[in-house]
Amino acid sequence: QPKSTPTLTVFPPSSEELKENKATLVCLISNFSPSGVTVAWKANGTPITQGVDTSNPTKEGNKFMASSFLHLTSDQWRSHNSFTCQVTHEGDTVEKSLSPAECL
């Protein structure tokens, strides 16, 4: 089975959620094979380990997909310039960043 590097999409928190002082970022990891991935989140380049919830990969056709959630408060979300979802797969690292300023 050919190796396939994951595609990442990062979604910002919803405005409804921010009103409740919560912020959940979602990193969608898709189209990868084989199934082993390691997900790390960073805020302004610094690793975040708390509030991270990553699903087990599920098979979609002959590829896999997974998602990782980063649970923050709205203050944490607003107080950083960038959030990055970093995925390591078969020795390759792919990352996708999201900037709160672009989401206002």
Curated annotation (Swiss-Prot):
SMART domains: IGc1. Residues 6-99 form the Ig-like domain. Transmembrane segments: none annotated. Disulfide bonds join 27-85. The keyword Disulfide bond applies. Pfam families: C1-set. Keywords: Disulfide bond, Immunoglobulin domain. It comes from the Eukaryota. One of its GO terms (cellular component) is extracellular region. SUPFAM superfamilies: Immunoglobulin (SSF48726). The keyword Disulfide bond applies. InterPro entries: Ig-like_dom, Ig-like_dom_sf, Ig-like_fold, Ig/MHC_CS, Ig_C1-set, MHC/Immunoglobulin. This is Ig lambda-2 chain C region. The lineage of its organism: Eukaryota, Metazoa, Chordata, Craniata, Vertebrata.
